[in-house]
Amino acid sequence: MGRSRGNFQNFEDPTQRTRKKKNAANVENFESTSLVPGAEGGGKYNCDYCQKDITGKIRIKCAVCPDFDLCIECMSVGAEITPHKCDHPYRVMGNLTFPLICPDWSADDEMLLLEGLEIYGLGNWAEVAEHVGTKSKEQCLEHYRNIYLNSPFFPLPDMSHVAGKNRKELQAMAKGRIDDKKAEQNMKEEYPFSPPKVKVEDTQKESFVDRSFGGKKPVSTSVNNSLVELSNYNQKREEFDPEYDNDAEQLLAEMEFKENDTPEEHELKLRVLRIYSKRLDERKRRKEFIIERNLLYPNPFEKDLSQEEKVQCRRLDVFMRFHSKEEHDELLRNVVSEYRMVKRLKDLKEAQVAGCRSTAEAERYLGRKRKRENEEGMNRGKESGQFGQIAGEMGSRPPVQASSSYVNDLDLIGFTESQLLSESEKRLCSEVKLVPPVYLQMQQVMSHEIFKGNVTKKSDAYSLFKIDPTKVDRVYDMLVKKGIAQL
């Protein structure tokens, strides 16, 4: 596939494997980048046999003899000069600096990309980028995905829109690049103080993040960092560890295209590549969905919600894939608003059953109820904390039965009407779970109906209240004890 093994007869020159390095002073670096003959700083090449100027032209470089070049004509007749022999392995040094498919990717870059993928395999984009030498890891990945994987002629690129130019246009482009380099060099000589250095990886990363996900991440806090750590998300690499469908690469681990493959085997391997491409697309879709919806960080909308309201929001997470971000946020607001209204209606109905006749009374009742629940929760916490300390003493002491007054008053704390009840009535309210205001209201209504003659037995009082008939029976029995009702 690559030029590094084209005509080498099992010989591999390590200096030619990755020849585009960051050191621009390397002569090998310029062998494929010099387009204009005699360009300044590019160096000239002469045929070592006929001494013809072959700068900027296709030439033959011997892989055994150091710094030995031949023109096409001398190579075709088998010219030899000691110590060079005509049977030495050689390399064709072409001029591939023109754009082929993309304006910012030369044909030389395309060949180095495919050669790097053949050597290091899919997924090792850092090594592939090092092999190309002029592109970053993100640029190599994006270019391979857009040009090769998403090509309608997969696995081949779409060659119907090749950015071809004639020789004059290519020379003009190269001359323009050389003029730009000269201008930059002059600027550096005039202004020796260089601007502040910016880490190239950071700038590339920021541009890649903005391009892929459409925005920067929110400012991280300690809570946010803990959520990111729990999700095993590496912010700097923008990867999960492990990734979704982490075993997808195992399909290609041992697969290799060979020259002796049958058409059926070749088609089968291409089908495996298509399946692998789809699995990568699904992995990318899920990752972009998580980043776009900001699922790695707490939702600001849920910051002021109660625990019950957060539970309601979590139940709707399964519908997030069917909505846009704005639609899902609107759904959460509507559901939370509905939950609050339903809860408010239940509280008001409970207050109404308790005998409240105004909003102020209902608020006082609900406030006392919440206060009582908080006190009971604190008491349970204290009792559980002290249980370990008094466990030994409990084993040595005889069991003490709690007083009936304490048990009866336990559920009646906070009701001023409880002062109007006797001990037996308090016990009745505790057993049947009736609050004092409701009990007094039932007693008043039943007494009024008994005096009018509408209630002569227990079953007659069932229609007066929309509660459990057993509670009505207990209240009626209490009126019988007081002599108001008759059996």
Swiss-Prot record:
Domain SANT, residue spans: 100-152
Compartments in which it is found: Nucleus
Post-translational modifications reported in the UniProt record: Acetylated in vitro by GCN5, but acetylation is not essential for biological activity.
Keyword terms: Acetylation, DNA-binding, Metal-binding, Nucleus, Stress response, Transcription, Transcription regulation, Zinc, Zinc-finger
Domain annotation SWIRM: ranges: 401-487
Phenotype when the gene is knocked out: Plants have pleiotropic effects on plant growth and development, including dwarf size, aberrant root development, and short petals and stamens in flowers. ADA2a cannot rescue any of the mutant phenotypes.
Zinc fingers (ZZ-type), renumbered ranges: 42-98
Domain notes: The middle domain of ADA2b is sufficient for interaction with the HAT catalytic domain of GCN5.
Protein name as annotated: Transcriptional adapter ADA2b
Lineage: Eukaryota, Viridiplantae, Streptophyta, Embryophyta, Tracheophyta
